[in-house]
Curated annotation (Swiss-Prot):
GO terms for molecular function: lipid binding. Keywords: Lipid-binding. This is DegV domain-containing protein DR_1903. It comes from the Bacteria. It comes from Deinococcus radiodurans (strain ATCC 13939 / DSM 20539 / JCM 16871 / CCUG 27074 / LMG 4051 / NBRC 15346 / NCIMB 9279 / VKM B-1422 / R1). InterPro entries: DegV, DegV_C, DegV_domain_contain. May bind long-chain fatty acids, such as palmitate, and may play a role in lipid transport or fatty acid metabolism. Residues 2-280 form the DegV domain. Hexadecanoate binds at residues 59, 93. NCBIfam families: DegV. The keyword Zinc-finger does not apply.
Length: 288
């Protein structure tokens, strides 16, 4: 069976890691010259640190030696002696480039796939890869399946405050002030390996309605039964529960579980984020 690795910022739950056997590359977080692990800087502490200092936190490149050790450990537990690494989108982070460089040390035993996305959308790809590997799929079959999954995944999220986008240099001070004053929430989506702006809405209720509408449109486009997740960063639990209730009122036979999103995404978009993740149910995730 082919082993599977991905990044710690893929927001895979401990239970899922246990049954899937996925190995994680630990993504470091940097703030004012200090380097932290995600365990050392969980979302609540991360948010407080950024708010207190007014300085951004960023995900840093993973050290080559750490990548090599993780690959070696995963290979040792693989019956086939082969490994697939699912990396976060190469347009978002340097992790794909680092993993691909290190993979060269292992020859044909390691294949690195550009996941083209982040957070739990990346985690879903890794879980599906592990599910396929458990069924005996080879490199080519896994790569083709993940390419199709990427094309048929919806990841759209509403940002609560513009302050973190300002701190990270994505918008200016004036734009952040006006946007917060008006109660505007940007709606962002990951499409074709990039983050794109979809809309700006006023208030939580409008944000949830827009996410619900995006799900309806996606379901109509795919014409398939979906897997649904209501993601949230810290502080976004209430909005996620509201979204969950509205999704379940429409898609009565489909669960839409809440899924916490960790420090990697929080560092970039802040607390209070609510997201919808959807993809066809035929893409199995093992025991999920």
């Amino acid at each position: 069976m082919i082993a599977v690795t991905t990044e710690s910022t893929a927001d895979i739950l401990p239970l899922q890691l246990g049954y899937s056997g996925i190995h994680l590359l630990p993504v470091p977080l940097g703030h004012q010259g200090q380097v932290y692990s995600e365990r050392e800087l969980p979302p609540d502490q991360l948010v407080n640190l950024i708010r207190t200092t007014g300085e951004p936190a960023r995900t840093l490149a993973i050290d080559d030696e750490v990548v090599a050790r993780t690959f070696e450990a995963a290979l040792q537990g693989s019956k086939s002696g082969r490994l697939v690494h699912v990396a976060s989108g190469s347009r978002f982070t340097p992790h794909f480039e680092v993993a691909a460089r290190v993979a060269g040390q292992f020859g044909v035993r390691v294949q690195v796939i550009d996941g083209g996305t982040v957070s739990y959308a990346l985690g879903v790809q890794a879980l599906h890869a592990a599910h396929l590997a458990d069924q005996g799929a080879d490199f080519g079959q896994i790569a083709r399946a993940l390419a199709e999954l990427r094309e048929r995944t919806l990841l759209t999220f509403a940002v609560e405050s513009l302050d973190f986008l300002r701190v990270n240099g994505r918008i200016g001070n004036v734009a952040a002030f006006i946007g917060n004053w008006l109660g505007l929430r940007p709606l962002l989506a990951v499409e074709a390996g990039e983050v794109v702006s979809k809309a700006r809405v006023r208030g939580q209720a409008a944000a949830v309605r827009t996410l619900l509408s995006a799900t309806h449109q996606f379901q109509h486009q795919t014409g398939e039964t979906l897997r649904l997740y209501c993601g949230h960063t810290i502080g976004g639990e209430g909005a996620a529960e509201q979204l969950q209730g509205q999704l379940q009122a429409v898609y009565r036979d489909l669960p839409a579980p809440l899924h916490p999103l960790g420090s990697g995404l929080t560092a970039n978009v802040g607390p209070g984020v609510v997201a919808v993740l959807a993809f066809p149910r035929r893409f199995g995730l093992g025991h999920a």
